[in-house]
Amino acid sequence: MKGKIKLIIIALLTVLLVSGCAKKDDAVKEENEDTKTVAENTETSEKDENKADDEISVVTNIYPSYDWVKEISKDTNVTVKNLTDKGVNLHNYEPTAEDITSIKNANLFVYVGGESDEWAPDAIKESPNVTAINMMEVLKDNIKPEEVIEGMEDEDEDHDHDHDEKDDHDEKDDHDEKDDHDEKDDHDEDEDEHHHHHHDDEVEMDEHVWLSLKNAKLVCNTICENLKKLSPKYADKFDENLKAYVEKLDALDKKYSEELTNQKFDTVLFGDRFPFRYLVDDYNLKYYAAFVGCSQESEASFETIVFLANKVDELGLKSIFTLSDSDHKIAETVKENTKDKTQEIRVLNSLESVTSNDNTSYLEVMEENLESLKAGLN
């Protein structure tokens, strides 16, 4: 009996011993797994942090420069955001608080620098860590003033006409005023003339610089140099990408020169505002248009319509051009006022409303513009 009790006690002790060891092993295993998980999470977090620290953020405000940055930064650590990627035209764009924050958080900000970007300098001042590229400053030797040519509506002249009518009305009212009041009015008139003269002296520069392939090449070089400073380890890749892209720009520039030479017509007639001065000047083309490139006008005067229609008849033009993102109404009205009314309405794309969702590229759009010009000038 004593022997059986002894065996039972030994068996119980053995079970307790094995159970205790198993629990200890499980605890050690669980502790090891927890330690491994913490280590893995820490490593992942460090990798994500390093990736974020290493990433170069670029913000642009028009599709062409967005596309140039994308091309130059292929297979590198650069991310690009375009502020007008929702399809808003550059001339109508107003930055949101989110846009300003994007600029503040960016390493590089590429903007046009023209009349439509009057908000940009203040945004840059609030972003001390961002490097800014003003395209018009880069191209300062190539910048052209907006010009009002024959037949084109001059918004300043319309303003002057209204101002003159007001002066005539004031002059009539002055006949009933006292001499001392006349003296005050004369003083005010002198001031008005001074301010008006100052307004006339202001020259608005044409901001549509991206529509010249030659300008595109210069801006791309500047973008590349700045990316190399921001991310030196990818310098060779930036240079490689730039070289490949510039070759494409040069090839298309050459194609423009060759295919627009010796066309039947050398004049582009535009029933719209005209942002293509850099383009036509590059290839020695003449032009007529309803408005200057930055005009906000949408309806042309009777005189402008008649002038353009008569010019179509005079030159025997077979095509009337307009912007791809316009309603084409002015071009159609010009056509209806020509003698035979058989002209083709053709479009050119100014790239002001193109977005990354349009499944195209700067080069593709410029190629399409060439084809439209060739068809319209034959």
Please describe what each predicted stretch is.
Residues M1-G3:
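N-terminal secretory signal peptides that target proteins for export/translocation
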Residues K6-I10, C21-N378:
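Extracytoplasmic metal-acquisition and chelation regions
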